[in-house]
Amino acid sequence: MAIKFIAGPCVIESAELLDAVGERLAAINRTLGTEIIFKASFDKANRTSISSFRGPGLEKGLQMLSDVRAKWGLRLLTDIHESWQAAPVGEVVDVIQIPAFLCRQTDLVVAAARTGKTVNVKKAQFLSGADMRYPYEKAREAGAGDIWLTERGNSFGYNNLVVDFRNIPDMLKIAPTVVMDCTHSVQRPGAAGGKTGGNREFVPAMAHAAKAFGANGFFFEVHPDPDKGLSDAANMLRLDDLETLVKSLL
């Protein structure tokens, strides 16, 4: 099975950002023979603070994602937070993602699966890898085209996450594709005064450790200038560092 790569900014900030990232991902795909899937959120519905930037919203966001596909020929992934969003999102993207906090929401998982698109279900920060059989079964019974499971760490006290890499082989017993979210797993939730902190310097180590445990997909949030990012600034990877990391994982 070919290794899957997913990369893009945390949130849709501007058309210019999407264009810059799309151009670089397309170039990496040509150079390395990969098929990196472009990801970005049209709405960050679970930001820490009411004043945090959320994105352009569904209608405008989907149009901006469509423009990325048209210009750069990239497959697309975005996440949904409410069941009614599944149908319009399914008309635009190749992969519908279920956020970790929402992976037990039956109606949400079923709505995504009924589009027939690939569904990427992120493991909640409070679940074990073995627990992911239940969201997987919901998506399978509802007719998902393909189902991926994603590891993104577990809560460790307050404002911290740790990764139990044993979850990866446990989830591989359930689904053939297990993705490592290498950037959200280095978050420090709510630890930066009304926003999430993080430690991006650990992203490459997370990726290689996950590969050693059998992960066959890798998820990276990237930005040309992460510290200026409007969401998850502390844990996004520099766009210029992505190609070297992807190459090292092939």
Predicted regions and their residues:
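Active-site glycine- and acidic-residue-rich loops that bind
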Residues: C10-E23, K122-R133, R152-D170, V186-P204
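Glycine-rich, proline-tolerant flexible connector loops at the mouths of alpha/beta enzymes
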Residues: F5-L17, I36-L58, V222-D232
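Alpha-helix-loop-beta-strand connector modules within alpha/beta enzyme cores
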Residues: E23-L32, F53-L77, A112-T118, I168-V178, ...
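Hydrophobic faces of well-ordered beta-strands that scaffold small-molecule active sites
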Residues: F5-G8, I36-A40, L76-T78, I96-I98, ...
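A short alpha/beta connector and helix-capping loop motif
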Residues: L18-G22, Q85-A86, E91-F101, T106-T115, ...
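Conserved anion-binding
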Residues: D43-T48, L102-D170, I174
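Active-site-adjacent loop and "lid" segments of alpha/beta metabolic enzymes
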Residues: I50-E59, Q97-L102, Y158-F165, S185-K211, ...
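N-terminal active-site wall of soluble small-molecule enzyme domains
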Residues: A40-P99, R104-L108
